[in-house]
Amino acid sequence: VEIFNYCESNGYRYSRYADDIYISSSDYLPIDVKDTLYKLLQKYTFGINFSKTGFHSRKSRRKVTGVVLTSNGELSIGFSERQKIKKMLYTYLVHENGEPRKILGYLAYLKDIEPQTYNRFITKYSSYCNTDVIDALQEKCKQDN
């Protein structure tokens, strides 16, 4: 609460997810503010990973807890994660090699973050199995039980 209050009273935004803490501002944090924040974090036994500490503008790629915030403010799973899902789908549907449950999990993640991309993938990859790709994966999961 003390860190949150300090940030709020100085015009900064404090966000936390598990052990990841984010201090957001429209500009670089002044040295005295950084020093105060470091002291507060240490007071509450938070370690600081300086390799993950930095300034990210709207022009740079911002990845927070595995989700990319694009320059236009949209959420994305990122190019490499999309490629991974494509590869898993193709490998499973064409070569029958892969883990259907894992693929379904990745597709659920994609659907939450990028629903339009999810719909494109479902349409595209359903043509590989002549049915709905989700139905095909779920059916395989039932058979494996």
Language-model features and meaning:
Residues 2-5, 27-145:
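Right-hand nucleic-acid polymerase module
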Residues 3, 7-26:
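Catalytic palm active-site di-aspartate
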